Amino acid sequence: MAYRKRGVKRENLPQQHERLQEKEIENNTDVTMENKNNNRKQQLSDKVLSQKEEIITDVQDDIKIADEVKKSSKEESKQLLEILKTKEDHQKEVQYEILQKTIPTFEPKESILKKLEDIRPEQAKKQMKLFRIFEPRQLPIYRTNGEKELRNRWYWKLKKDTLPDGDYDVREYFLNLYDQILIEMPDYLLLKDMAVENKNSRDAGKVVDSETANICDAIFQDEETEGVIRRFIADMRQQVQADRNIVNYPSILHPIDHAFNEYFLNHQLVEPLNNEIIFNYIPERIRNDVNYILNMDMNLPSTARYIRPNLLQDRLNLHDNFESLWDTITTSNYILARSVVPDLKEKELVSTEAQIQKMSQDLQLEALTIQSETQFLAGINSQAANDCFKTLIAAMLSQRTMSLDFVTTNYMSLISGMWLLTVIPNDMFLRESLVACELAIINTIVYPAFGMQRMHYRNGDPQTPFQIAEQQIQNFQVANWLHFINNNRFRQVVIDGVLNQTLNDNIRNGQVINQLMEALMQLSRQQFPTMPVDYKRSIQRGILLLSNRLGQLVDLTRLVSYNYETLMACITMNMQHVQTLTTEKLQLTSVTSLCMLIGNTTVIPSPQTLFHYYNVNVNFHSNYNERINDAVAIITAANRLNLYQKKMKSIVEDFLKRLQIFDVPRVPDDQMYRLRDRLRLLPVERRRLDIFNLILMNMEQIERASDKIAQGVIIAYRDMQLERDEMYGFVNIARNLDGYQQINLEELMRTGDYGQITNMLLNNQPVALVGALPFVTDSSVISLIAKLDATVFAQIVKLRKVDTLKPILYKINSDSNDFYLVANYDWIPTSTTKVYKQVPQPFDFRASMHMLTSNLTFTVYSDLLSFVSADTVEPINAIAFDNMRIMNEL
């Protein structure tokens, strides 16, 4: 922007046209210029006072320079020519500024907000059945000669038999089983919800769940069931102790399943709920805030229960060296915070039209086309003011870093920026953006006022421009204001166990605005000795516009502080402050809009909004801690199960997926492994540790109930005779390994040293390879005879590949369709392999009948705040922490 020389008066006022007449400029030229100027003023005045917000433009013809002016040699005409030449460039800056502000700076990401709000406490699910791994099944009994008897026998088998072969894979199966139990582990059990009628009961009794009822039916109908057991089933019913609110239900469970369910019943997370707990659940600062009137609607019954949320703090310190993860968390918090910050609607703001008209009068914009003050009105609208208000509060609540966008030639933006830097702590801004804004304020306003040379700032200087200026400026008020900004930091205060970032008391009560105004008044009184008069006047008028709204700025500062602190009371995770990877853009023109349009109407969050914000924060925080506990338990279990090939990164990925808000594939690997290392350092939560120990103690029992795998194989060069087995008939099964040399199959495969086996086999010594192997059955006698002469292990020893071993279970019994082929009882079937298979646990009704105890009834409430009715005082009467109205300017 080109400026006139000192002492040169404005040329487009009527008095100046008279002078041009006196100085022998032709009358026609004067009339033409005067008409053009009048028309231009009229058009621009209409546009400024119009309710429509539109870009101010000039008629293109006006930019063409008149031939008469070109030919004129007068000094005034030359200066006018210079101004008109630069006006087009200046207009582009104005249009850019307006365009920047009319484009919305924030697009709400509904998907992230929905993910956050959809995180619900899992305890809301009702448990409709007991946890079971086993179920009883009937298996036939075989005679000594291999014929099947008519009798049956009951054994415990796996409900879902998916056991893989291979010791390592079996251990991985148990890890997956553990993970499944952690997901399904109920926070509470109410047996009354799942109880069903016992069809065989003589007095309409109930048993604990449908599976128990089905087992009872099957046993009752089994011909071999003893009469005493039938009579017992007929007597099975619940036992109620109403005075103690307790009920006992009969159940039929495998001892391991009973141990799990008994543990779940004895370690429920529900706690008694009463009015006092609900009232204490409300954040203390909301309870004690006189602007909110809270009341309990009803008393709770003695059977009311709730699950205390898990709100442990900073177990992983995601703010420390996890840039991508922290950026995602703060972004989610920012989107959530924006949704709860109250809106400054048009009725709460000063009328944009009236305010722009008043500003035009203050600026005396009769010479609108050639004054730099034109930009002061650019982009002022209520939408921008509301956007700025929400951005400032939401960014502080989520500790999101902001970056500033501004045009240096718009002095009004920079003066508004001085208010912004006064009120918002420096840490909230990207350092480079903060330095650029401070440097623009110093070199545009502060240093020119005192006639000081421009500041040449070295990139990378540890000091900010304001810190350098504070040491160089002699004026007390300005230096004092700079000192305040340079030391404006959040104060970290722990309130209710949560680290809060609180504002300086001078900001909270608005007194800092007086300090800002003193500095601005001092600057406006300076002479700007090295700058043109117009420059000084533009700065002074910008300061005048802001200083005219001193009362409103104090109120605005108090309003921002109050809304920030009230919403901050609903945050449950520590507010750690770290500069974020991405930033939220803030236009300084929107700050101008906020400063100029803020009215005297108080807006505070509604109680329902506060409760919603609090509930979402609690649910996310609690889910975050529960998922940490799951991940820590799985990592510990993987180590204790010696899963040396397990990719820990997959456990960390599952952990992040269950937190809902992360785009896991985009998280850098270094942060994944760092997260793994931090998870490894955490202790396992007690309930999860106990459950894992239960699995660890019973792995063998679970494994032997599977029909998919055997526990080893005995191999020999000499044929071994098939033996009778009660469950399978004549088969090559061994039920124990007594007398055999044992070698661990997994170790053998890892080392690859088969010499020991080869030597033993060559010496005609059978050897037992112990490990989980496929339990393959083949009852076709034809295929059996085809394989009898084959030496099963010879090929394996030759190839040295033990993992290809598929031991075969040979069945020769009366079930075979080809049984007539082996009617010659002199023939003795043999095999060079014997499958080692442990005997599953027989089903014993008496040992499997357990009485389970739980409360007869209780009601679990997940939304505690639904019992609280809340209202606010009239917003105009709302008071801040200092017991004065938030908005004093009426």
UniProtKB/Swiss-Prot annotation:
GO cellular-component term (any):
T=2 icosahedral viral capsid
Is Ubl conjugation there in the keyword field?
A: yes
| Biased amino acid composition, Polar residues | 28-42
Q: Which InterPro entries match?
A: Rotavirus_VP2
- What post-translational events are described? Sumoylated with SUMO1 and SUMO2. Sumoylation of viral proteins seems to have a positive role on viral replication.
- Where is the protein found, in the record's own terms? Virion
Instruction: Locate the site labelled Interaction with the intermediate capsid protein VP6.
Output: 232, 236, 849, 851
Query: Does the keyword RNA-binding feature in the UniProt annotation?
Result: yes
An example Pfam family from this entry, by short name, is Rota_VP2
- Quick one: where is this thing mainly located? virion
A GO term, aspect molecular function: RNA binding
What ranges does the record list as Basic and acidic residues composition bias? 9-26
- 5-fold hub: annotated segments: 1-88
Q: Where is this region: Hydrophobic?
A: 404-424, 432-452
Classify the source by domain of life. Viruses
Which protein family is named in the record? Belongs to the rotavirus VP2 family.
**Whom does it interact with, and what assembly results?**
Homodecamer; each decamer is made up of two conformers of VP2, called VP2A and VP2B. Interacts with a VP1-VP3 complex. Interacts with the intermediate capsid protein VP6. Interacts with NSP5. Interacts (via N-terminus) with NSP2.
Print the domain comment field. The N-terminus binds RNA. It is necessary for encapsidation of VP1 and VP3. The N-termini of 10 VP2 molecules form a cylindrical hub underneath each 5-fold axis of the inner capsid.
Role, per record = Inner capsid protein that self-assembles to form an icosahedral capsid with a T=2 symmetry, which consists of 120 copies of VP2, with channels at each of its five-fold vertices. This capsid constitutes the innermost concentric layer of the viral mature particle. It encapsidates the polymerase VP1, the capping enzyme VP3 and the genomic dsRNA, thereby defining the core.
Instruction: Report the protein name in the record.
Output: Inner capsid protein VP2
